Amino acid sequence: MAINNNKIVIVGAGLAGLFTALKLAPLKVILITSKNLGSGTSSQRAQAGIAAAVGKFDSVSSHLNDTVQVGGGIVDQKIAELVIKNGPDRVNDLISLGVPFDVDENQELILRKEAA
């Protein structure tokens, strides 16, 4: 039997899965989800909260330190640093796609502390 390695399969219909599918466009992807797109996902339960170092007083190093401290000893520091360094760019990508983040009267993102 021949194996076809040209298929891209994304499991999950939350923000990460759908964003990945959009970033891979125009490639075709197979999206596996247990519910309708966007419903019943961790993204929905998180009320669109995203942890990213986008504040004036935030930094990659402080965000990474916080992540490692609350990670229960299972954080891969290299992967966490890669994700955190790219976080602001991914937030900007989401904004350009029309994700309705909460903003203040100056159209600046409203930031909150994430639980941990």
Predicted region positions:
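A short, basic/flexible loop-to-alpha-helix module at the beginning of a structural domain
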Residues: 1-5
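N-terminal Rossmann-like FAD-binding beta1-loop-alpha1 element of flavoenzymes
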Residues: 6-31
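Conserved N-terminal/central alpha/beta ligand/cofactor-binding core
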Residues: 34-116
